[in-house]
Amino acid sequence: MVVLVFGPALFLILISLGQCEHKFQTLPEYGDIGEYEFTNSEGDIISNETQKDKITLFTAIQTSCPEQCAIDIAKFNLLLYQDYRKNQKNMGHVKFVSIVTDSEGNPVNNLDEIIFTLNDIIQGFDPSIWNVVTGDPKQVYDIENNDINLYSATSDSSFAEKPYLETMLIVDKQNQLRLVRRGNQEGLIRDFKQHVALLQKQYDKAAAKVEENEE
């Protein structure tokens, strides 16, 4: 479980409203996401070990997509996936992991249906970039602050009354949680993308500093 260190009001902003202003130049670290293990459509294990040195973008995705999705799958595809798919030379370390659930948030073992759908609606769908996985979403969504737990929280305004199904996560190369953001609106997805870019700038700046010190 990740226990978030910011105050409850900010937690509610991040989880419930998903609003944020850029008042910092670096993304805060909220804690280690912990151990997790999923299985992708190729039968390969996706875990905290396989994702070392990668920026991992987590979502949940429903077998009812694209007709009924917790995240805006069309905007997620156009604003996020397509950009990173077309820029694998420089951004091949950014990976997508979508945990498949049914419309009620229960884990789904058979991935054939959703893989067929994504191949049909997502241009250039590539499982090596976008891992669609089976497993318990609680492994990464068990995020808590002041007795408010994202995985077990309920809200009448959320998909299936479960806010975590709408929530995107940024986990960095060291398995640290860096951002929690809803993914059901275009503006929030754009904001999420900006934070991924901000994290990448942090890595670029750190790498440049190391290179400078070695000269």
Task: Report residues per predicted region.
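Structural micro-motif
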Residues: 128-130, 141, 145-155, 161-169
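Thiol-/selenol-based redox modules, centered on thioredoxin-like
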Residues: 155-215
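Short loop/turn microsegments at loop-to-beta-strand junctions
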Residues: 33-34, 56, 165-167
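Short active-site neighborhood of thiol/selenol oxidoreductases, capturing the structured segment around
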Residues: 48-76, 95-100
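Structural microenvironment flanking redox-active thiols in thiol-disulfide oxidoreductases
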Residues: 73-143
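N-terminal targeting signals for export/organelle localization
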Residues: 1-39, 215
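Hydrophobic alpha-helical segments, especially N-terminal targeting/anchoring helices
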Residues: 39-40, 171
